[in-house]
């Protein structure tokens, strides 16, 4: 009944924000957590450049399972991006380590959490909602919507689709199955996923990264974690980890593609969905 262009909502504890906006056909679409983080960081970077506030010491942070499109935006705009483990204590750690030497300008994760300022050391929906309103006003000044800005990002930096698959294994037998699955991935790492060769494997339990030729380099992380990541030649990223709170193993899938124009979203998304299904078939999930 009310002609809205955007709907946003905080969680009851005010730590995460979700949103929906209208697409180019006037239909409501949900913006996922990866897209939310991407939009926030894209705007922060572009706004700092446009207003002359960008400094060589600026940096942003994302978690290792969050979309790699953020890295593409950071690299093209020559800003340092740091990867950390899931959880905002790790983002807060990066802020603390660089306090007085570098300037944190934003960071987030794929599960709708974002931290826009460094005076809060946890995900904060209050400042995120204020930032969201600012982005919407910025878009409107250009005659665009939030959806249009997202399409602009995909055209400039490439299209990506992210999917999380949860494989539930209840009980003690389930915990044993999850352990066996992780052990099997380590003992028999896939050489190909979804029809594309694996070019890099990261094992955060051993803190080692191994490329397709067997060359091993160290991962610079503060401690070990039971997480595996696979990167393929076509830009796909798969992250695998047992849940720390529930009886399940989580697969974070991100596939890449090209999007030639803002109106090409449907075809780019359809191709990405095919890639996701191919990845799931390869992994047996």
Could you describe each region identified by the protein language model?
Residues 247, 252-262:
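A hydrophobic, small-residue-rich beta->alpha segment in the mid-to-C-terminal subdomain
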Residues 33-44:
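Catalytic or ion-translocation cores adjacent to nucleophile or general acid/base/metal-coordination motifs
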Residues 1-13:
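Single conserved hydrophobic/aromatic residue that forms the stacking wall/gate
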Residues 9, 19-29, 47-241, 259-265, ...:
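Phosphate-binding and adjacent anionic-ligand microenvironments
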